[in-house]
Amino acid sequence: WRVIYVEGGPFSDYQRIFQGLALGLEERGLIENGHVPLPKDSEEARGMWEWLHQHAGGKRLVFLADGFYSANWDSQQREKVRQEVLRRIREKKDVDMVLAFGTWAGQDLAAQDLPVPVIVSSVTNAVDAGIIPSVEDSGRDNLVAPIEPDRFKRQVLLFHDIFAFQKLGIAYEDT
């Protein structure tokens, strides 16, 4: 399977999720080496992609050398990336699977009728973002967008189990 990576822009959470994905692929025998190092002092995942291209090994998955796409949080670049990825999948036909990291990438690829699997990761709420229609079903046989509706409730309960707090304050930025 020839794989590409698409993101809206660099984000440190993508690195950790991508690293966990690589380790899971190794654990399941899909690649030989999933021990991709996290970049220091950077939120970029491109270096991780390049590392996997060179070191993942195995015969099942190929991380395409030119298969890393990022819009760098630029809305004009986002459209260019979307068009380039769609053209590559539909016309060049050298992609068998897409890893879409974040809301932008998930929205841009979920809305398309693509002939390849799309795995969406690191989206706070894929239903609210319009990536999938419901928690029960992505609406497309080739689209996976994991969602955990009670995530924040579970986090607070876990935090309470650990620290047994009596009062809880929440700091947030009203953006």
Q: Language-model segments: which ranges?
A:
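Short hydrophobic alpha-helices and adjacent helix-cap/hinge residues
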Residues: W1-T175
